[in-house]
Design a protein with these regions (language model features):
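Nucleotide-activated chemistry modules centered on ATP-dependent adenylation/adenylyltransferase
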Residues: 1-235
Length: 235
């Protein structure tokens, strides 16, 4: 049976992505990430329990909540010391929220690559959706993330990236006999783009920052921590 690591927040997007992969024959391993700006991480396990009850322990595994604060700090360190003029001159205009989301998502992906190598998993799934108005969930960025995973012989899947209608999203649960109400964690940093924002400008800046500043850091971080089990709690 093929194995897939699922970035699982307990929300509807990650839950539906999990269901779709189970239906495709995957054994799924759910992992939740905490960047230390999360509330309600305990809620995530409730979503796992619902999936386990419906699909069985053999198909659904739960890895728990893993701390990515250290990786996140390494990625944001240089950028947080830049003046606004340096950011604009070197990368273009970007909102603070979209940079935070870019660095956080990349931290999740770096940790996912490490976990996949440790557990011999060849697939990762993320519930990213174009319609959510995050720069990192647009096709231009998703394709770059696919390239990153390919370097490590891992395929990242975005099962619902083209799903635009939240009404249809809920129906996907209902037709499977699942109530579309969920318990999920809440990130305090994640703020989607305003519909009136010049999102192409921010998207292009996100791409520049990823390629020039963040991507060069990924392999050194992976090599440094590849044999370390990610932390569950801080002592």
């Amino acid at each position: 049976m093929k194995k897939a690591l699922i970035l699982f927040s307990g929300g509807k997007d990650s839950m539906l992505s999990t269901i779709l992969l189970i239906e495709q024959g995957f054994q799924v391993y759910l992992v939740h990430y905490d960047n230390s700006f999360e509330l309600g991480s305990i809620n995530v396990k409730k979503g796992y329990k619902r999936l386990e009850k419906k699909y069985g322990k053999d198909k659904v595994k739960y890895l728990g909540t893993k701390k990515i604060s250290g990786i996140f700090r390494e990625l944001i360190k240089d950028f947080y010391n830049y003046k606004s003029s340096e950011i604009i001159n070197n990368y273009g205009e970007i909102s603070i929220s979209q940079f935070n989301c870019l660095a956080c998502r990349l931290a999740m992906y770096i940790q996912s690559i490490i976990i996949c190598k440790q557990l011999n998993i060849s697939y990762v799934a993320d519930g990213a959706r174009n319609s959510q108005l995050f720069a990192i969930e647009q096709d231009e960025m998703l394709n770059l993330f696919k390239e990153l995973f390919k370097k490590y012989n891992i395929n990242i899947l975005f099962p619902i990236k083209n799903l635009e209608d939240d009404f249809q999203l809920k129906n996907e649960f209902l037709v499977r006999g699942i109530i579309p109400k969920v318990n999920e964690s809440q990130c305090l940093l994640g703020i989607p783009l305003n519909k009136n924002t010049k999102d192409k400008e921010i998207l292009n800046s996100s791409i520049n920052i990823y390629k020039k500043l963040l991507l060069p850091k990924t392999n050194p971080i992976i090599e440094r921590y590849k044999n370390i089990k990610p932390g569950d709690n801080y002592l």
